[in-house]
UniProtKB/Swiss-Prot annotation:
Coiled coil: none annotated. [4Fe-4S] cluster 2 binds at C19, C38, C41, C44. This is Ferredoxin. The keyword Metal-binding applies.
Length: 56
C-alpha cells in the first residue's frame, strides 16, 4: 500500500529528500508520490511537519 500526499502539503520538500527511492516530486501545487515506485517505508510521513503523507 503506497503513500499519497494530502492537500495539507505546504510544499516544503522535506519528504522528497528523505525518500530512498525518489518516488516524490514537486507537482503543480503540492508534492506527489509515484505509487508504483513507493516502497511504503514511511520516511516521508515521519519527517513531514504537517502530516501530509498518508497511506492509501
Amino acid at each position: 500500500m503506497a503513500y499519497k500526499i494530502a492537500d495539507s502539503c505546504v510544499s516544503c520538500g522535506a519528504c522528497a529528500s528523505e525518500c530512498p527511492v525518489n518516488a516524490i516530486s514537486q507537482g503543480d501545487s503540492i508534492f506527489v508520490i509515484d505509487a508504483d515506485t513507493c516502497i511504503d517505508c514511511g520516511n516521508c510521513a515521519n519527517v513531514c511537519p504537517v502530516g501530509a503523507p498518508v497511506q492509501e
